[in-house]
Regions:
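Long, charged/polar, surface-exposed segments that mediate recognition or autoinhibition
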Residues: 85-147
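Short, exposed beta-strand-loop hairpins at the edges of beta-sheets
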Residues: 149-171
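N-terminal low-complexity, Pro/Thr/Ser-rich intrinsically disordered segments
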Residues: 27-60
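Bacterial signal peptide processing site
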Residues: 22-24
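Sec-dependent N-terminal signal peptides
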Residues: 6-13
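Short, low-complexity, Pro/Ser/Thr/Gly-rich segments in the mature regions of secreted, periplasmic
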Residues: 68, 165-180
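Positively charged n-region of N-terminal signal peptides that target proteins for export
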Residues: 1-5
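C-terminal motif of bacterial Sec signal peptides marking the signal peptidase cleavage site
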Residues: 17-20
Length: 180
């Protein structure tokens, strides 16, 4: 009888502990819900805003970026951010020039792990068009690589959306020289 009572007590205690774990997992990390929702609502304005900024000034953008170096650590490339744009997970690569100033941004919307649908391409075309206010130029399919691309020439930057099989990226580059 004592053995049965002890077993039931241990099972009940274990069940209560497990219930406490699931409750703890469901709780917030201490960040207010409004702030969590706000941080997940990054847009193209946030990514384009990286251009021309010093690396030190954008280190904490999008919740913090990881330094990106060449394999031999001889050249600093820029930063990699794992974040969300418009609530969708993306990887943002910010590329620095020699002065550690952000020269270009590449947003990997998909990385080949999932199928790219026509709807997803259209959604991003609409987002870029709405953000830039520029007309989209269909660049067609490259004969060499098979990449399909679309381009927007905005006042200060140009935006190129590229699709290669199941990889969809958006590059943002400053308009310089003849492009300006």
């Amino acid at each position: 009888m004592k053995k049965t009572l002890l077993t039931i007590s241990v099972l009940a205690l274990s069940a209560f502990m497990l219930m406490g774990c699931t409750t703890a997992g469901a709780e917030s990390d201490g960040t207010p819900e409004a702030e969590q929702a706000e941080t997940a609502q990054y847009t193209l304005a946030d990514t384009a805003g990286l251009l021309g900024k010093a690396d030190a000034d954008v280190a904490d953008a999008f919740g913090g970026g990881e330094e990106n170096w060449t394999a031999d650590k001889s050249t600093y490339i820029g930063r990699i951010y794992q974040t969300e744009l418009y609530g969708d997970p993306v990887t943002v690569y910010a590329v620095c020039g020699e002065e550690k100033v952000m020269d270009a941004v590449s947003i990997w919307i998909t990385d080949g792990e999932q199928e790219v649908t026509d709807e997803l391409v259209q959604t991003w075309q609409d987002r870029v068009t709405a953000f830039t206010g520029a007309e989209m130029e269909d660049r067609g399919v490259s004969g060499e690589s098979g990449t399909q691309s679309w381009r927007w020439n905005a006042e200060d930057n140009f935006y190129t959306l590229r699709l290669l099989e199941d990889i969809l990226t958006l590059d943002i580059n400053p308009a310089v020289g003849e492009l300006k």
